[in-house]
Amino acid sequence: MSIKSFLARKWAQYIRKKIDLWAKDPIPTQEKILSSLIQKAKNTVFGKDHHFDQIHSYEDFVKQVPIRDYEALSPYIERVKEAQTDILWPGKPLYFAKTSGTTSGAKYIPLTKESMPYHIQAARDAIMCYIAQTGKADFVNGKMIFLQGSPILEKKNGILLGRLSGISAHYVPKYLQRNRMPSWETNCIEDWETKIDAIVKETIKEDMTVISGIPPWVQMYFERLQEKSHKPIGELFPHFQLFIYGGVNYEPYRQKFEHLIGRKVDSIELYPASEGFFAYQDSQNEKGMLLLLNSGIFYEFVEADTFFSENPKRISLKDVQIGVNYVLIVSTNAGLWGYNMGDTVMFTSLSPYRIVVTGRIKHFISAFGEHVIAKEVEEALAQAVSKAGGEVSEFTVAPQVNPASGELPYHEWFIEFEKLPEDMETFANTLDQGLQAQNSYYKDLIEGKILQRLKITCVPKSTFVEYMKSQGKFGGQNKVQHLSNDRKIADNLKW
């Protein structure tokens, strides 16, 4: 055992104990966070507009601060972008994290001196929890790669602007900098394909032990490595131990990854966003990610089924239930208030509070009232691959409302297979049965002869890569939308 790995184990045990302190005292921790946020922001423009000085309880907060999405909050954000002070949070932000927006245009999310450290701390703590639980720390002696956006930042009215992953690159702890890859120069390459090729060249002969990124882009990295080396990734990097990911559900990609690697590796799921680092997987045995309750973020929840009603009920952490699909609402020490993340989550545990991300409130299929969500299609696909074989590179699902020749409507699955199932009919049946098991409304529509069984359209290799290029969303933190309530994506796939 090296000194480095020995110290990592000791440090991990210390960090885990600190985490357990607030995890075991969740409701008071959240109440203190809300009180602190209100107190610090009461003299801001937003605080005065919403009478923060009159807020003394969660009920007061709900009355004074409505739920807003980015567009509704943008009048305040525009003033922050103009370098006005004390608008949403005291002073001015350190950065704007620019995001293309999952369901809308470009967003400028403020990052403050209070919020930024938590983004870095959470990523570190996720790794520490892994070490504390498993005792595995030898990976700290090898090289680590984080596939991320360019760290080159621009200035807008004196405030630095960039992608969150690029901003985070400026905060890599000194003790990781020697082990971290790729080089700064390579990380600054904007064109994703050029960047991947440069990363492959830099890393192919290194002792890579930790690899991190969004699964579809890490998959591309692995494929390029394999093209060059003609070896499984696990043989090329014999000490590769840990895959860290976020942004999309890993399960649809898992079988393909294990084939590329040639063996199983441990993984840690993260839930980072420009708006905050909300959760991470703290256990290799328990389902879900630990909700971060002591990171300057106050959480609220609205049942997804009621979210678009006239007056949806907001609840705080103490009233959530396991197995209910909630829209995530946050108020943060970066000046977001009653902010609709657009994400939906479900609790898998209440002691401690653990969640899984189930999708986006605007990403669903409900052309016939079925309200199928991302979690359901992803789990059904993972089960179909497990039972009927095949390897999936990427996919998306769209409704076919008006099929030709008078047949019943159906869900159309566009799947890019790396390896076809032996029997496509069996695969399609298994997939449809899996989706029916996930969603009773869909099952009722099938049994009631309103819908026919789903249909699979196999698309050639690189179809989704070409689609993402055509949309200007190739590489980095962008990901393919796995389902939609119209055929905009489906009709733009070219092959």
Give a label for each model feature.
Residues 28, 32-96, 108-114, 118, ...:
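Active-site diphosphate/adenylate-binding microenvironment
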Residues 105-110, 363-367:
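Short small-residue beta-strand/loop micro-motif enriched in glycine and branched aliphatics
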Residues 108, 144-146, 267, 456:
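Conserved beta-strand scaffold positions in the cores of enzyme catalytic domains, especially
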Residues 110, 115-122, 243-244, 267, ...:
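Long, hydrophobic, well-ordered secondary-structure blocks that form the structural core
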Residues 123-124, 129-137, 142-144, 179-182, ...:
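Extended alpha-helical, oligomerization-prone segments that build pores/tubes and scaffolds
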Residues 96-109, 456:
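Conserved adenylation A10 loop of the ANL superfamily
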Residues 1-53, 61-68, 76-83, 167-495:
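Active-site glycine/GP-rich loop and adjacent strand/helix microenvironment
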Residues 130-174:
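Conserved AMP-binding loop of ANL adenylate-forming enzymes
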